């Protein structure tokens, strides 16, 4: 069995790491390079950086941050936010990203996922899916969770896999920042529908929630922000807890 990964997520805006609840109410969590260094030392398997207010004016800022982090941190970095063209993927990879996450542009231009995967390989293309429960299914939202698309999240996941996404970063908007646990039904539905790895995101409040994400949600990796940024738990504690519960992790 492949080791399950623990991935701290750093939401970056204006050069700072922030954390919100349900995609709003952001509070400052610190300097990205310092935080990344700390996670590297604590044994994180990977780091995910999301430029959550990515626009043309701070696009270069995230490149500088990626370069600074990549020069100090030697675990895989996934970077997303504002990726609109294959050239953006190239720039992030050149800056030191190992994987590039595409979210809004995957919806507005699905061909981008295929073109990027064809050029750089599926292993470095992640599609981020922000999903919200609507009636009896989950709908995909874009633009940092502000825009409804009408797309069914499970069908969308299958389409993204078929276009070449090598991993899916799945966030439950209903659970984001609430610390009530992953939306396990959503995670499981998408895990069962595709063969590529699923990173579960949105809602971790306890270490048991991470175990549940893997066990019940069938996630390949669990992503968390608040519980790590504000010192409630350390990455090594999370790994030890998962190991005690029979989940294979890299210690």
Swiss-Prot record:
Pathway annotation from the record: Amino-acid biosynthesis; L-histidine biosynthesis; L-histidine from 5-phospho-alpha-D-ribose 1-diphosphate: step 5/9
Active-site annotation: 11, 130
Known partners and oligomeric status: Heterodimer of HisH and HisF.
Family as reported in the entry's similarity comment: Belongs to the HisA/HisF family.
Function field: IGPS catalyzes the conversion of PRFAR and glutamine to IGP, AICAR and glutamate. The HisF subunit catalyzes the cyclization activity that produces IGP and AICAR from PRFAR using the ammonia provided by the HisH subunit.
Disulfide feature: none
PANTHER family: IMIDAZOLE GLYCEROL PHOSPHATE SYNTHASE HISHF, IMIDAZOLE GLYCEROL PHOSPHATE SYNTHASE SUBUNIT HISF/H IGP SYNTHASE SUBUNIT HISF/H
Keyword Lyase on entry: yes
GO cellular component terms attached to this protein's record: cytoplasm
InterPro entries recorded: Aldolase_TIM, Glycosyl_amidation-assoc_WbuZ, His_biosynth, HisF, IGPS_HisA/HisF, RibuloseP-bd_barrel
Protein name listed in UniProt: Imidazole glycerol phosphate synthase subunit HisF
Keyword set includes Cell cycle: no
Keywords per UniProt: Amino-acid biosynthesis, Cytoplasm, Histidine biosynthesis, Lyase
Coiled coil: none
Source species of the chain: Thiobacillus denitrificans (strain ATCC 25259 / T1)
Enzyme class: lyase
GO molecular function: imidazoleglycerol-phosphate synthase activity; oxo-acid-lyase activity
Gene Ontology biological process terms, A to Z: L-histidine biosynthetic process
Reaction(s) the record says it catalyses: 5-[(5-phospho-1-deoxy-D-ribulos-1-ylimino)methylamino]-1-(5-phospho-beta-D-ribosyl)imidazole-4-carboxamide + L-glutamine = D-erythro-1-(imidazol-4-yl)glycerol 3-phosphate + 5-amino-1-(5-phospho-beta-D-ribosyl)imidazole-4-carboxamide + L-glutamate + H(+)
Superkingdom as given in the UniProt entry: Bacteria
EC number(s) recorded for this UniProt protein: 4.3.2.10
